[in-house]
Amino acid sequence: MRSSSLLARPTVARLLTTMSATTLPGDVKVTEHFLSVPLDHSKPDGGSLSLFVRELVAASKAADDLPCLLYLQGGPGFPSKRPAFPPSGWDKSALATHRVLLLDQRGTGRSTPVTAKQLLALPGGPQAQAGYLEHFRADSIVRDCEVVREALCGGKKLSLLGQSFGGFCILTYLSLFPDAIERALFTFGLAPVGRTADEVYAATYKRMEERNRRFYQRYPQDVELVRSLVAGLHAAPAPLPRGGTLTARRFLQLGLLLGSASGFEALHDLLELARPPSADGLPDATSSLPDLFLLEVEAAQQHFETNPIYWLLHEAIYCDGGGGGGGGGGG
């Protein structure tokens, strides 16, 4: 039986604040909105969250009755993209015909955030933490979008653009409120409907094997470098400049970079920072790793601290009905 939160209808929003509009380069009028939404849409009189939406419109068309395009960011656990001005890419194309709404999904960015400190402070331990995080899944995000549609678009149908996990949210939106959507555009992020999370894992392993093979084919000089670093970190984990420890296992998690289009070069450039200024260019167990390398490792892995939803709910986005646990890629 479905939980009440899955069956709940979104509530009417309370528009907390609309900031003064600003016109930026490229003739774009930018308005920032804060809305109040329930933590649990099935219990509208319970706790609430603040939701942040940045609205973009061509200044010359600001008074026109334009349709809305809502952008759903990848993740889970990441705020909406911050646009460049003057606009380019899809932003520029969309602004020719639409008002563009950039939503910081609940728990991210300037919406009420989820933080490690906040979760650890919840009374009730891990069970309470898991219960709280249940309210930050796609079903709640979609109900927030319905609140945004009513408050900022006058209840008119939305066009949706979903990046990665944003596409997962679109599928949930189409399942729950199909009549609210004019059109839905996916950029990656077509969820593996009908497949268990374990099957996603298996496919991801094969893909990562191939990405690793291609990486070392492109940069064969990194084979011995990585082996040397792993051996050294096994023998003596390295303290990181801002706290924490770089173990061999944590170092190998840098392989996540291989999942992006520019990841091969990003990983190679980072590894190069670990090379000592010597003829063979390989670190040994007796030498300290360069501070710049350690700082860049921290920067590459900062999402552990800044985007906890990604690490805590990432696997859950692949659950399909009563399927197995686990999860794979995304982003």
What are these regions (language model features)?
Residues S4-A8, V200, R218-L225, G259, ...:
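Non-membrane alpha-helical secondary structure
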Residues M1-L16:
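N-terminal mitochondrial targeting presequence
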Residues P237-G331:
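Alpha/beta-hydrolase fold active-site neighborhood
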Residues V12, S20-T245:
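Gly/Pro-rich cap/lid or specificity-loop segments adjacent to the active site
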Residues S3, A151, D179, A316-I317, ...:
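A generic structural signal for solvent-exposed, polar alpha-helical segments
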